[in-house]
């Protein structure tokens, strides 16, 4: 009976701790090459469920590779995760200690005080990995963040949006690139974006 009560209390206490910072999630890093480094993952898109996928990625990076990972979300006025609120990013202060940023954002219009945390992090020269809609992470002029930082903004959908799938093929000569370690040709039930990468871009997959 004591063991059952102890187990129940542990689960209840763990749930309480998770709710104590319910505007963001932090996974402490275990042992691995990323030990001592902090990755901040920014979710905020209306189509690709970054609020679900990025916590999964953060857990993998923390448990298998040792990185401390913090996931930030778009919230509504009730404090609930709401990717349609383009003006919100929870706990932006986490960016102040970021060693890298992974982002899946779309058309965000954050307040200036939130932008400042992001700008300061980028201006430190830390790596930024942009996924899918991050080419148009922020609503603004053509040639903005996507083009200047990631190498391309939004151009068009290649294939029928929400109707066709795609196949990704590893670029010839890129097979041994460490980024592709363990990766083979891929298939996705989604169309892709048309892009015109910079002349000095290294293409790993088409």
Regions found by a protein language model. Give the residues of each.
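Bacterial N-terminal signal peptides
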Residues: 6-16
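Short alpha-beta junction capping motif
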Residues: 38-44, 94-140
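Aromatic-Pro/Gly-enriched surface loop or interdomain linker
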Residues: 20-98
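Extracellular/periplasmic catalytic domains that process cell-envelope and extracellular macromolecules
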Residues: 31-35, 93-97, 121-124, 172, ...
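An acidic, glycine-rich "communication" segment
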Residues: 35-36, 131-206
């Amino acid at each position: 009976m004591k063991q059952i009560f102890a187990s129940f209390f542990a689960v209840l206490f763990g749930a309480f701790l998770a709710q104590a910072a319910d505007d963001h999630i932090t996974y402490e890093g275990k042992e691995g090459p990323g030990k001592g480094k902090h990755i901040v993952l920014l979710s905020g898109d209306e189509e690709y469920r970054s609020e679900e996928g990025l916590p999964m990625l953060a857990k993998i990076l923390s448990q298998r590779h040792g990185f401390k990972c913090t996931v930030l979300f778009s919230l509504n006025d009730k404090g609930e995760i709401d990717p349609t609120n383009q003006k919100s990013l929870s706990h932006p202060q986490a960016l102040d200690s970021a060693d890298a940023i992974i982002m899946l954002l779309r058309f965000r219009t954050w307040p200036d005080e939130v932008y400042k945390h992001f700008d300061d992090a980028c201006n430190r020269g830390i790596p930024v990995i942009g996924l899918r809609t991050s080419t148009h992470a922020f609503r603004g002029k053509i040639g903005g963040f996507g083009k200047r930082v990631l190498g391309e903004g939004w151009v068009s959908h290649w294939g029928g949006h929400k109707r066709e799938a795609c196949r990704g093929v590893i670029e010839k000569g890129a097979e041994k690139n460490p980024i592709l370690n363990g990766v083979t040709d891929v298939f996705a039930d989604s169309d892709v974006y048309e892009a015109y990468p910079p002349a000095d871009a290294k293409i790993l997959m088409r």
